[in-house]
Regions:
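Hydrophobic/aromatic beta-strand elements that line small-molecule binding cavities or substrate pockets
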Residues: 60-62
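Basic, Lys/Arg-enriched alpha-helical interface segments
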Residues: 1-57, 66-69, 78-110
């Protein structure tokens, strides 16, 4: 959704490899070891892949809410000073993209 694919490609190659494999694992119905449920969405269908490289934290957020596809909602380098919590602007973007994905699925567009 949105700029997620472009954002993913801008990350370090090792991070892209981890996220790519984690998304492949999600497509098989399983969960990668670096994946956890992202809280605040009411169920376990929005997940976050967490990767750290050279002191930097990276996140890929996706949903398995739809039968037709695993939808990547947001990919970013975490720069929050508030500990492990995902920053509010990122959470707002994830929520907006999830809403848009839900609308597209209801319209019959995967």
């Amino acid at each position: 959704m949105g700029s997620s694919k472009k954002d993913l490609r801008a990350l370090p190659a090792d991070v892209v490899d981890v996220f790519g494999y984690a998304l492949y694992v999600a497509q098989t119905g399983k969960r990668h070891d670096h994946t956890k449920v992202l809280k605040g969405f009411g169920d376990a269908s929005v997940l976050e892949v967490i990767e750290s490289q050279a002191g930097n934290a990276y996140r890929a957020v996706y949903t398995v809410r739809f039968a037709a596809a695993v939808v990547v909602l947001h990919v970013f380098q975490k720069k929050s000073k508030s500990g492990i919590e995902t920053p509010k602007p990122d959470m707002d973007l994830i929520e907006a993209r999830l809403k848009k994905a839900t609308e597209l699925v209801k319209e019959g567009r995967p």
